[in-house]
Amino acid sequence: MRLEEYWGIGPKTSALLSSELGVDRAVAAIESADTRELTKAGLSRGRATRILRRATGAEAMDLLATRDTRDVYKALLDLAEEHAVTEHAADRIRVLTPLPDRAAMEERLSSVLDARDAWASTDEATRDDVLAAFDRYDSVDGGELSAVRTALALQETGVDDGVFEPIATLESDRLDDAARALAGLRGDGDRVGDGADDQLDGLRDQLGQVEDLVATSPEVVEELQSEARRPDEFRDALTRYLTSETGVDAARVRDAAPQEAADARDFVESALRSLAGDLRSAVDEREATVAATLEEDLAAARETVDAAVEAVDDAALYVSLARFALAYDLTRPTFVADRETIAVRGARNLALQDAGDDVQPVTYAVGDHDLPAGREPPTGDRVAVLTGANSGGKTTLLETLCQVQLLAQMGLPVPADDAEVGLVDAIVFHRRHASFNAGVLESTLRSVVPPLTDAGRTLMLVDEFEAITEPGSAANLLHGLVTLTVERDALGVFVTHLADDLEPLPEAARTDGIFAEGLSPDLDLEVDYQPRFETVGKSTPEFIVSRLVANAADPVERTGFETLAQAVGEEAVQRTLSDARWSEGDSDD
């Protein structure tokens, strides 16, 4: 296969990968989603991630129909990545994509939840041991040696169920043999590494010391001349000196000494050069013997090594996702095939949870659902128009539904106590973008309408469409979008402040509302974020005006806010500010 057939790989990138990896290795790295291999070849991590997402999930990536949907997808991966136990696990999380069918989603879900349950039942000390083993694996770039050593360390922790079972079943003796072989063969270039063979290490040490003496031969001559005068004495003194200083066998030193020399310096230099050459040959010979033995040992353990790399990589990935699931109390969604729906009970927005905000769980649904009894949304309505208070969590609810749908179709657990999800082909999430520019309106319509008109199932999540055009036209366009969504048998939630202008809605659509309930003792707006079904929400501006009146320090400014209070309903404002002084005399002050 040509590299340029992959999305995002042009002539320049193809040439780089071909040069650094070769075509076959590059193709293998792309097909196996190996970010590490591509970044070592010179690609940036971000570029490698984009290429691999398309290579491994090109068709499923069409689910991300708008920029805002893609932003939610990336934010979810960022949250999951924070819980990665190795860099390679983080790389694999970054290239997770929506899956093409329900069977694949269920399979990944089961793996993640099995890992979650195993991790949750593991005591803290064992968790620390497991994380330390993964950290050790991460510290040497995730190579085969590191994977084998990590497998051995994980076996020592005693964890042997779930994602750790493939590691626990590996033969420890084979892993030990493989670790020694890999450690020996991981020297620079073709060099056998230090520690692989005691004899080889000894020869290398002797060679290094002799080479150091070659560089300081005049000092050696001077020292020997102080001890010996006659040639035979000088020869014996050199043998004793080199044996003492380098540990080289006396016979090898005598064999290296020249029979004739012009003077003492020539004799010492010739002997040292000859001895260094002899040791160099001995090192090469021993290294070749050791390398051959190590390669035989590694070949015998090859199957175990490959299994260890795969098992450790998979365990790292699923432990990372398990930690993500536990951190946010994620649960298994129920996939439904006989009806179209997205329905959640006790759903929570992950972005708010990550920020440390207090999150009110909400229950919501569109389509035909079968949520457990309780505050159950109406069933059968394919489209909902969501209205209500400013800062009432309407956009957050859209984002939460987007998170649930995306995570489910990625085969990951979702942030809800219960969730029913029908699979869709496109998620059209569109945030509020305030601009009356005609270009913005056109680009918005081009992004939200085609997924509806294309063949396939669509989830529409559209926020305050009126923000991009004047109210009259916005109401007409939004009514058209709602109608089109119903006619195309899609699902949708549309946030708007123009509910009254949208009547009458199509039969399969309803209106829901979020209500502001008052001000707290600290004059913070209190909102019930749980939508009330089949009713128009109220933004209750008197609460906002009440807060402005109470907080106004300047008398003139307060008078202005009191005028606004009369406009929105002075009685309501007085009721809200029951603890605040409200009289003409106060405002005159």
Locate the predicted segments by residue.
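Extended, EK/Q-rich alpha-helical coiled-coil segments that serve as long dimerization/scaffolding arms
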Residues: 171-185, 219-277
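Coiled-coil heptad-register positions
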Residues: 211, 218-232, 239, 280, ...
